Amino acid sequence: MADASSRTDTSIVVDNDDKNHQLENGHSGAVMASNSSDRSDRSDKLMDQKTIRRLAQNREAARKSRLRKKAYVQQLESSKLKLAQLEQELQKARQQGIFISSSGDQTHAMSGNGALTFDLEYTRWLEEQNKQINELRTAVNAHASDSDLRLIVDGIMAHYDEVFKVKGVAAKADVFHILSGMWKTPAERCFLWLGGFRPSELLKLLANHLEPLTEQQLLGLNNLQESSQQAEDALSQGMEALQQSLADTLAGSLGSSGSSGNVANYMGQMAMAMGKLGTLENFLCQADNLRQQTLHQMQRILTIRQASRALLAIHDYFSRLRALSSLWLARPRE
């Protein structure tokens, strides 16, 4: 009986030890599992934070992109509205009889606001030129005959003659408006010379668009470019001399007292300055005449197909300058 009791007690002790060992192992496993779970949770949280930040950055970038696109579209819409307003003003000007008619007497002075009238006429001129250039491009791509191309080219050259006449009339009304190029886009004004393009620079731009050229054509174009450059230099020097003379006249009696004699001297100086300003119109007319003659001489040197390519290249160049101005003004500003 005692032995049985002893075995029973020993069995109970062993069983209890086994249970305690199992509990300890279970607790240790639970702790390890808990620690592993905590590390996994922290890792998941870090990954979630990175993902959230990345998504937030992507959303912000997309939002800014939408804003830039919206601003660009709004700028284009605004430009369309301005163009529509200009067309309406042009119609009003025509109804009131203050525009320069292409079939009428170009020597009549502009009435009303000369600068506005010229701007409206120039807008109309550009629209008509775009139509003519599109017709020429279609004919060139369709390999039209030389006679058909000549009709279109002659029409475009006559259209250039028209804008020079309109500028001459506008210069009588407001020579500063024409010289400053306020009727041009900002990018065009960067390359402006005496109210228009430099003929010699235009010939340089066309060099790669006219090949192949004969030796006689090359010689003719080189001579034309040199003579244009010499005429430009002479006009530029004349303008510099005029500016210096005008500055000297205006600075003649700076800081003088307001006596009657000084007032008379002041009025005399202003009269002299006004007379010198009158020569600005002459400089502008000479510069436009140089531009006009260069275009016509270029046409005479080239074949009709080369002249067609030249007119297309000239138009595309100035169109890109205008487009560059529009893109620059519509660029996103952050």
UniProtKB/Swiss-Prot annotation:
Q: Name one GO molecular function term.
A: sequence-specific DNA binding
Instruction: List the residue ranges of the region (Leucine-zipper).
Output: 76-90
UniProt record, GO biological process: defense response to bacterium; DNA-templated transcription; positive regulation of DNA-templated transcription
Q: Start and end of every bZIP domain?
A: 48-92
* Composition bias, Polar residues: 1-13
Q: Which domain of life is it from?
A: Eukaryota
Q: Does the keyword Cell membrane apply?
A: no
Any Gene Ontology CC annotation:
nucleus
* Predominant subcellular localization, coarse grouping: nucleus
Q: How does it assemble?
A: Interacts with NPR1/NH1 and NPR3/NH3.
Instruction: Quote the protein name from its UniProt record.
Output: Transcription factor TGA2.1
Q: Which organism is it from?
A: Oryza sativa subsp. japonica (Rice)
